């Protein structure tokens, strides 16, 4: 091999080495797989009867029906504290509520859209709060300010409340079934 060919080969190798991608950062994942997580104690469904209300009860946007308290009984909960993503250590969790079918009302993404088998009502949605203080639970995302629930033992009750909220004036509400389903995930982060 002549000197020119060797020089070209060395030059090409040097150029290839110089074009390597530089890293701007690293993503490090941490977590834990647990053997004990809370489960719904009485099957995987909690039924909540919100009641029957006249559209005239909702005079303006934001009017509410009476609250309906309900409990999600949990069993097999962890009894030892664990470290959360914020660095704190406790026996607490958040609920991740994921809407189904109708999603959210659109006018207010914090209200569950109602559905019905025949003709669903319009102009109302369902709000879900922590019962102890009325802190609203976010839908399809985590709350900006965490709404946590403490684990008090292997059996723990999650006390919530729900109610209808109008998204339009009374005259624009249409009568019909006002049902909804929300999937619940217990979030230990």
Predicted regions and their residues:
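Mature extracellular/passenger domains of Gram-negative fimbrial/pilin and adhesin proteins
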Residues: 2-6, 21-189
């Amino acid at each position: 091999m002549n000197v020119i060919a060797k020089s070209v080969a060395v030059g090409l190798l040097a150029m290839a080495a110089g074009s390597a991608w530089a890293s701007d950062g690293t993503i490090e994942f941490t977590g834990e797989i647990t053997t004990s997580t809370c489960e719904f104690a009485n099957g995987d469904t909690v039924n909540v009867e919100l009641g029957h209300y006249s559209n005239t009860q909702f005079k303006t946007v934001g009017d509410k029906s009476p609250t309906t308290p309900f409990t999600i009984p949990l069993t097999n909960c962890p009894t030892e504290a664990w470290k959360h993503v914020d660095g704190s250590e406790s026996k607490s969790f958040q609920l991740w509520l994921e809407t189904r079918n109708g999603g959210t009302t659109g006018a207010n993404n914090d209200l569950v859209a109602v559905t019905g088998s025949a003709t669903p009502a319009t102009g109302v949605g369902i709000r879900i709060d922590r019962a102890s203080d009325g802190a609203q639970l976010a839908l399809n995302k985590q709350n900006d300010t965490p709404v946590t629930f403490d684990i008090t033992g292997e059996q723990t009750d999650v006390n919530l409340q729900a109610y209808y909220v109008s998204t339009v004036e009374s005259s624009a509400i249409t009568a019909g079934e006002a049902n909804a389903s929300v999937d619940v995930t217990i979030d230990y982060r």
